[in-house]
């Protein structure tokens, strides 16, 4: 099944994707928010937080950018096959530069927070993005008035680790692993997986 989907993406027509004309730059990959790599990521946010658009700085290397886009789309298909939640993703274009749109998974009354912010909520200052750290945070959150299903929380983190191993993802860190915080119930859960390339 995945090979059939891979063939579908091999002949992708990016021009048929969305045209994003109301976006604003929210983050560039690399240290201090500025791209330091030859092929850094550039993130844009659609109005009202509906989605984010990710592209790359490699404007003269279309094949590399297209392969990264295809990788992101294939990872979404893999997530679906192995039962890991992943937001809707589709190819898009902004000012003639191709990328992918990842739609917001937070519903009304929910906030999307990254692992770094989650560590701060749990008053955990020595966060190192390890499995043990997430188990510790799941134990600590109720102390600060948050609800968490520890078993599901830790299980979801393990699934992500296994998925990243299978897909050779070496860039999963505290700023691209997300959690959903329900503002009324104060429940925290692992968010669908984004930024898989």
What are these regions (language model features)?
Residues 1-162, 166-169, 178-197:
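Phosphate/dinucleotide-binding and metal-coordinating scaffold of catalytic cores
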């Amino acid at each position: 099944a995945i090979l059939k989907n891979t063939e579908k993406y091999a002949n992708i027509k990016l021009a048929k994707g969305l045209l994003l004309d109301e976006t604003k730059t929210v983050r560039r990959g690399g240290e201090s928010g500025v791209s330091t790599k030859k092929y850094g990521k550039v993130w844009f946010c659609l109005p009202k937080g509906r989605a984010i658009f990710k592209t790359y700085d490699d404007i003269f290397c279309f094949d590399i950018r297209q392969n990264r886009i295809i990788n992101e789309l294939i990872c979404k298909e893999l997530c679906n096959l192995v039962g890991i939640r992943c937001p809707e993703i589709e190819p898009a274009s902004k000012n003639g530069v191709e990328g992918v749109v990842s739609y917001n998974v937070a519903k009304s009354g929910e906030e999307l927070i990254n692992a770094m912010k989650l560590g701060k909520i749990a008053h955990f200052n020595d966060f190192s993005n390890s499995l043990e750290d997430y188990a510790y945070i799941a134990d600590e959150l109720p102390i600060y008035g948050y609800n968490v299903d520890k078993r599901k929380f830790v299980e979801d983190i393990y699934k992500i680790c296994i998925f990243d191993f299978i897909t050779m993802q070496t860039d999963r860190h505290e700023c691209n692993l997300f959690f959903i915080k329900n503002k009324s119930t104060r429940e925290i859960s692992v968010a669908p997986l984004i930024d898989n390339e």
